[in-house]
Structure formats: C-alpha cells, structure tokens
Amino acid sequence: MASKSIKSHCKILKKVKREIIKTLDGSTTIRLPEWDECYHSKHGAIQEAKHVFIKNGLSLFENPISILEIGFGTGLNAFITYLEAVRKNQKIDYVGVEAYPVDADEILGMNYAAELEALEFENIFEKMHKSEWNEKAEISDLFSLTKRKQFFHEINDFEIFDLIYFDAFGYRVQPELWSTEIFQKMYNSLKPNGVLVTYAARGVVKRSMIEVGFTVEKLTGPPGKREMFRAFKKV
C-alpha cells in the first residue's frame, strides 16, 4: 500500500507548478507554490547542503567512498560533493536517485557554480546533468556519477554505500517517503558502520529510523533549522 501511495503522490508532483527562487544565501532553488515546498532550504540552499551533507556526512570519511543520494533534484549536493572530492583528492562513487528529473531549463536557472565561486567547474555541473540516466558516467578521475531514474521504494541495494544523503521532500508534504519501509531499504543499502544524514528532525522520523535498526543522534541544524538527524548502521 505504501508503494502505491508513493507512486500516486509522485505523479501529482509531476503536475505541480514550479518556480525558481533565490534563497537567503543567494543560491537558487525550485519552489512548488501549491505545496509551499522547496527543493532546498529557503534560508540558503548552499548553506544547507554544506552543513547537512558535507560537514555532518562526507567529512567523516576518507577515500574511497560510495554515496547514495535520495532525491538528486537540481544536482546541488552532487556538485558540492564533487568540489570536496577535488579539494581533498578523494575518490567518490556517487549514485543519485530521482523519479522525476528536473527540466533542462530549470537547471539553467541554478547559479551554484557562481555562488560557490567555482565557475571553472561549471562544465562539471553541466556534464552531470547531460550524463545519461541509469548509466555510470566518469565525471573525472576522482568522481563517478550514476543517476538512477526510479522511485525510492524500488531501491533494493544491499550493503553497497558508505554514506546516504537523505534529501527527500519534507514529511509534511510526503510522509510516505519517511516511512519504516523506506528506511529499511536505506539500512539495507548501507555497509556495516555506514551513515545516513538528513535535514529532518521530526520525532516520527527518528522512531522510523530506530525501528529498522539505526542508532540516531540529533545535531545542530543548518541556518533556519534548529536540529537535524544523523543515523548510524552500527554492527
């Protein structure tokens, strides 16, 4: 039943009106007015990505590392992770899952390379979005990217990933994406001692994580959000 609910909600998402907005740190994101929901925090898309996924996720690991992103979206998290790979000379195998890819014209409205002062890597951001879906692309010697076009409930990986960026739409608009069914799949996908990070901090989300076996800790959230979760697959 949960899987049918996810598909139904995602079909609705495909039809929802979308607009590009500028967040408080100057970086852009996509907003769904009917849901009052954004792809990233309105308080700062780049600030949120760096705080949640880099500072509290990627920084825990040395190379090589395998990452699963739940909600590839605009590609911001992948791009920032690529920049970190270059900075640290860290080899990263990155998999981004997205049921409904962002349109090409929307991608043109994303100003991440400029806001990150990384215009020399703007071609990398473009390369990520031009790469074929469901095929592994060697973005550079350090960074490979596989964009998988699938629903989250269709994920059936087993102990492949070191780190998961859980960046689905919020519980308020898509609670089915934060269920025990989905988190069981996340737990199964992680290697022993793997880590999942997310911007979320609702009690119901924490309970779902704990129910499937995660050890969960609450951390200080990004600007505009008091708290966030980091979960470990401890063995």
Q: What are these model-derived regions, one by one?
A:
Residues 2-65, 83-116:
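Rossmann-like AdoMet
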Residues 75-79:
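Glycine-rich SAM-binding Motif I of class I
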Residues 108-157:
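S-adenosyl-L-methionine
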Residues 212-235:
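Core SAM-dependent methyltransferase catalytic element
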Residues 71-73, 98:
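Conserved S-adenosyl-L-methionine
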Residues 145-147, 160-168:
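Short SAM/SAH-binding signature in class I
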